[in-house]
């Protein structure tokens, strides 16, 4: 199973996260398939490559709860559902 999840980066007490597509069995900071963006929790800032994200969602990648919260704040799911309904 493929998941869209966070990969911790940064130093101690100064974390930031890459939003990545990875196999569910891979370790948190281990191997990943593709990077989709990043998230800085201290500044509450996230940057997401929408084209890559929509492609992985269309393929059927599962999204973790934390990434789901980030995506909903950015409006990713709303736009994805609009795109999906316009294709049909």
Swiss-Prot record:
Gene3D superfamilies: 3.30.1320.10. One of its GO terms (cellular component) is small ribosomal subunit. It comes from the Bacteria. Signal peptide: none annotated. Keywords: Ribonucleoprotein, Ribosomal protein. GO terms for molecular function: structural constituent of ribosome. InterPro entries: Ribosomal_bS16, Ribosomal_bS16_dom_sf. Coiled coil: none annotated. One of its GO terms (biological process) is translation. Belongs to the bacterial ribosomal protein bS16 family. PANTHER family: 30S RIBOSOMAL PROTEIN S16, SMALL RIBOSOMAL SUBUNIT PROTEIN BS16M. This is Small ribosomal subunit protein bS16. It comes from Mesomycoplasma hyopneumoniae (strain 7448) (Mycoplasma hyopneumoniae). The lineage of its organism: Bacteria, Bacillati, Mycoplasmatota, Mycoplasmoidales, Metamycoplasmataceae.
